[in-house]
Amino acid sequence: MAIRGKSYIKTSWAFQERPVSSAKFNTWDDRIEAALELLMNLASLAWGGGDGVIRNASAGDLAVSARTPPGMAVSVAPGYAFIGRFPFRLSASTMVGGIASPVSHPRIDLVQARLDTWDVTVKQGTEATSPSAPEPDDDCLALAELYLRPGMTAVLDSDDGVNGYITDVRTYV
């Protein structure tokens, strides 16, 4: 298992090259990588060992909410999580746009935190008379489901019967 995500310093080297060609340095570097991986695994186990948001680690805990004024975008509050036993951090409130209303039937989209890029994306679901949410991608953590209706003009925090609304699906460690 290799260390993934932005929490690992080695990702700053574009092609995983090492600055020194010494075999001794390369062995030392591999031991540092193993130690960092062990440290991340132990930290994950200390928080419960699963994937999820770390409760009360920051003001927002990766909560998804409607924008002010409401529109076809949502905001995700900063927070910390573990995804695949690796730390994830969203340092500032982030606006996630690109949400399009369905054409003929309701649809459920998934707001997910992505480990490899430390950002938040929306995974589009499939339109259906009785829609279901898509599964999170690999190395992603589900934060919220967006129930979207045909002809809607905004995503709200609660159901008003006309527009789309947000359902919190965060899990905590």
Give residue ranges: language-model regions.
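Beta-strand-rich solenoidal segments
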Residues: 2-173
